[in-house]
């Protein structure tokens, strides 16, 4: 249904800024992107799952806010995250 602990730790490992980093915007955006990708695949099979679609919209909105924050604070890190995740802007 969701990401398991192994998948989360792999994502955190790829995007963290320091050895103990789990909450930086880059890590949060990467985790949200993985959940969004998982839900997108879910909707290819379950087209009528409107309740989960609402959750997807909330995740996309949350990711957008984090991306906007990162863009305001450090454009270089923002560009790096977008390129690494393949998010269009």
UniProtKB/Swiss-Prot annotation:
Coiled-coil residue spans: none
Keywords, comma-separated and alphabetical: Ribonucleoprotein, Ribosomal protein, RNA-binding, rRNA-binding
Single GO cellular component term: cytosolic small ribosomal subunit
Compositional bias segments (type: Basic and acidic residues): 7-19
Chain intervals for the UniProt region annotation (Disordered): 1-24
A Pfam family that the UniProt record links to this protein: Ribosomal_S15
InterPro entries in UniProt: Ribosomal_uS15, Ribosomal_uS15_bac-type, uS15_NS1_RNA-bd_sf
Function text: One of the primary rRNA binding proteins, it binds directly to 16S rRNA where it helps nucleate assembly of the platform of the 30S subunit by binding and bridging several RNA helices of the 16S rRNA. Forms an intersubunit bridge (bridge B4) with the 23S rRNA of the 50S subunit in the ribosome.
Protein name listed in UniProt: Small ribosomal subunit protein uS15
Biological source species: Halorhodospira halophila (strain DSM 244 / SL1) (Ectothiorhodospira halophila (strain DSM 244 / SL1))
Lineage: Bacteria, Pseudomonadati, Pseudomonadota, Gammaproteobacteria, Chromatiales
Protein's gene: rpsO
């Amino acid at each position: 249904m969701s990401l398991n602990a192994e998948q989360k730790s792999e994502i955190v490992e790829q995007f963290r800024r320091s050895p103990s980093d789990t909450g930086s915007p880059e890590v949060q955006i990467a985790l949200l992107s993985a959940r969004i990708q998982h839900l997108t695949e879910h909707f290819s099979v379950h087209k009528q799952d409107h309740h989960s679609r609402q959750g997807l919209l909330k995740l996309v909105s949350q990711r957008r806010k984090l991306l906007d924050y990162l863009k305001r604070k450090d454009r270089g890190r923002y560009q790096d995250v977008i390129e690494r995740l393949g998010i269009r802007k």
